[in-house]
Amino acid sequence: PVRPLALDLTDRSSFATYAKALTEEPVEVGLLVNASGFGKFRAVVDTPLEVNLNMVDLNCQAVMALCQLTIPYMPEGGQIINIASVAAFQPIPYIDVYGASKAFVLSFSRALNRELRSRGVGVMALCPFWTRTAFFDRATGDGGQENVVKKYVAMYEPEQLVQRAWRDAKRGKDVSQFGFVARFQTGLTKLLPHSLVM
């Protein structure tokens, strides 16, 4: 059965609501996908503090909390997929807070995957390149730094990422990336100084 829960994941009281829903009746969670998140393409000093705080709350705090609350209800063979970003691998001006929040998701997911090995539960960070979603409408819709996006050469469809993510999760990977451009850019961050890849 499906039971929808409308939650504001930037509000900590939502975690209590979610935890209560898990205990109200016997439940087993075979798959958890943490896909909520947002970014802003603008300088830190030009972004309202409340926006950046909400970004960290949603992109980091909510991912950690939902994982921690859900894990006790996951059977052996269960899977957690946390949506990170190719931005997790390098500092990127004008999306600094977003990129740093996704670096948290990447690091947290990889470490948690190792922790849960004995339970038989997998954790994978999906690190997509630019993807054609409503994310960009919110990120640039109020005069943000659209050129941050325009300078990149590829834009992928969500269906492509889902297929790749599901395949990689079944293979037990802790990180999933789709497309040559994403893997190439990530490779550069391991070889070149940050000053050259930013």
Residue locations for each model-derived region?
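Active-site loop-to-helix junction immediately N-terminal to the catalytic Tyr of the SDR YXXXK motif
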Residues: 47, 91-99, 111
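The beta1-alpha1 cofactor-binding region of Rossmann-like NAD(H)/NADP(H)-dependent oxidoreductases
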Residues: 6-17, 49
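Conserved NAD(P)H cofactor-binding loop of Rossmann-fold oxidoreductase domains
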Residues: 35-40
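Active-site helix of classical SDR
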Residues: 67, 101
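SDR active-site lid
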Residues: 118-182
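Substrate-binding pocket helix/loop in short-chain dehydrogenase/reductase
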Residues: 43-45, 51-56
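Residue(s) in the substrate-gating loop at a strand-loop-helix junction
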Residues: 85
